[in-house]
Amino acid sequence: MKILKEEVLFNCSAKDLWTILSDVSRSDWVPSIESISLTGNLRSFEMDGIGSVTEEILLNDDQNMTLQYSAIKTPSKIDHHLATMRISSAGEGQATLIWTTEIDPEIFADGVHHGMLISIEGIKKVIES
């Protein structure tokens, strides 16, 4: 199993960043996803270059600004996927996102990491708009 981690400082309040990420039906910050459908705690979408993906939302905690989800259906056989996004205040008008993803088999780690990086850039674009 590989554990990926990104820690990023954003020029917005923690509350504003949480508003973007806690809306699990929102896809404007993920460049490879056009739309998301929700059924209970499951979100499904088509991801460019990947295909149909279904994720289970395990935790969407407003108080601790933590989102946790797991890919449970993907075109490729993934034995384990667990992503956690934690937001904290980093002072006046700034927020820190710590995003970790556990992935197994490790062969998928580079692709998952690339997806994290382009999504972080997507978040920055949403904040700036």
Language-model features, listed with the residues they occupy:
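Short beta-strand-to-loop capping motifs
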Residues: 10-12, 47, 101-103
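Hydrophobic ligand-binding cavity/cleft-lining segments
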Residues: 1-37
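Glycine-rich portal/gate segments that line the openings of hydrophobic small-molecule binding cavities
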Residues: 25-76, 96
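Short coil/turn motifs at beta-sheet boundaries
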Residues: 1, 48, 62, 78-80, ...
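Intrinsic-disorder/low-complexity, polar/charged segments enriched in Ser/Thr/Lys/Arg/Asp/Glu/Gln
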Residues: 3-7, 42, 52, 80-82, ...
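Residue-level signal for tight coil/turn positions that link beta-strands
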Residues: 5, 12, 40, 62-64, ...
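Hydrophobic/aromatic beta-strand elements that line small-molecule binding cavities or substrate pockets
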Residues: 8, 53-59, 71, 82-89
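Beta-strand/loop substructures that line and gate deep hydrophobic ligand-binding cavities in soluble
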Residues: 73-129
